[in-house]
């Protein structure tokens, strides 16, 4: 079972979990009986975690005090794994990966090529969404680390991921028997049919890998490509290679994110402001009178003590929350929804270059005839063609105007 593609309700011994300690501090943990997970907020026994639902808050009393520390135990997801994984290379974060998968049209039927496995962040997101992932890594040590990680997470044997040690810029994407790969060849099988319709290139020189793609992309449907390039000079060379090898719909974008902070703000009416001014004036007048009485030093010591702190009833009027703690959304006040945007835009991670390609454009005769019949129902002026060579005749502008007027 893969912890990243399947879900369960309760935590069991041997599960891989992600422990949310604080914002930006997420740790991976393998649950083992008898062991203890130590943090600055306390020590948490694994036995106390087993059997609890995923997402539970686990609390312990801090030694030597009455304070409690707690953690949250979460089910692994690609988004949370991105926050906790060991960085072997620069990774693709969720704002970029989610947009890339949407632009590539990834689905459970997709067959994806990922060149540049790196730390495996994007590989986990692909594995959850697509039907088959072929990932390539040229650095042997990173390949071995990623392979061990994918096997531990159940993405190889029980999953849909194949990782290969290969320099795709020099040797291409074909996987053959004898290559260093996680793919298990059947008896008599000498190669793998990649047949990919989505390609993601996270390479220093993607323009060197583009010429090798025609041998492995799908022949019967559109293939979509994304190149992840930090420098604009890389983008320039990539565009030249895409145009040279027949790729179309070429576009380069960058993702820049700004966070909107939404909250409720107290509505301050004019009448409330006037009443507040009157209240301040009354308090000021009361203070002046009290100081005057103290200055005259009238009465006994006990009377002076009483005058220093006069017992006046606590006022219940507080239009702006002054003098008492008011929680956001308190029913005693009127609120409105407001939002504040970050003043600075977070800088981009890389340029994203998208393109698409169809190797062979073929149409089925029956499909075309059905489409023409459907179109005829909406436009009676078009005659349906029974064969591909029978196209609706073209008409001049004057003839079309005359037919429309009739």
Swiss-Prot record:
* SUPFAM superfamilies in the cross-refs: S-adenosyl-L-methionine-dependent methyltransferases
> What residues bind S-adenosyl-L-methionine, as annotated?
119-121, 137, 142, 167-168, 202
Its recorded reaction(s) are: adenosine(58) in tRNA + S-adenosyl-L-methionine = N(1)-methyladenosine(58) in tRNA + S-adenosyl-L-homocysteine + H(+)
Gene encoding it? TRM61
Basic residues bias (residue ranges): 281-293
| Primary localisation category | nucleus
Q: Which InterPro entries match?
A: SAM-dependent_MTases_sf (IPR029063), TRM61_C (IPR049470), tRNA_MeTrfase_Gcd14 (IPR014816)
Where are the compositionally biased (Polar residues) regions? Answer: 394-406
TM spans, by residue? Answer: none
Q: Name one GO molecular function term.
A: tRNA (adenine(58)-N1)-methyltransferase activity
Could you tell me where this protein is found in the cell? Nucleus
Enzyme Commission (EC) number: 2.1.1.220
**Described purpose of this protein according to its UniProt entry:** Catalytic subunit of tRNA (adenine-N(1)-)-methyltransferase, which catalyzes the formation of N(1)-methyladenine at position 58 (m1A58) in initiator methionyl-tRNA.
Q: What organism does the record attribute this protein to?
A: Eremothecium gossypii (strain ATCC 10895 / CBS 109.51 / FGSC 9923 / NRRL Y-1056) (Yeast)
User: How does this protein assemble?
Assistant: Heterotetramer; composed of two copies of TRM6 and two copies of TRM61.
Question: Quick one: a GO biological-process term for this protein?
Answer: tRNA methylation
Database matches in PROSITE patterns = SAM_TRM61
Gene Ontology cellular-component terms for this entry are: nucleus; tRNA (m1A) methyltransferase complex
Q: What is this protein called?
A: tRNA (adenine(58)-N(1))-methyltransferase catalytic subunit TRM61
> Residues annotated as region Disordered?
281-323, 385-406
Indicate the family of this protein. Belongs to the class I-like SAM-binding methyltransferase superfamily. TRM61 family.
* Keywords from the UniProt entry: Methyltransferase, Nucleus, S-adenosyl-L-methionine, Transferase, tRNA processing
Pfam family for this entry, one: TrmI-like_N
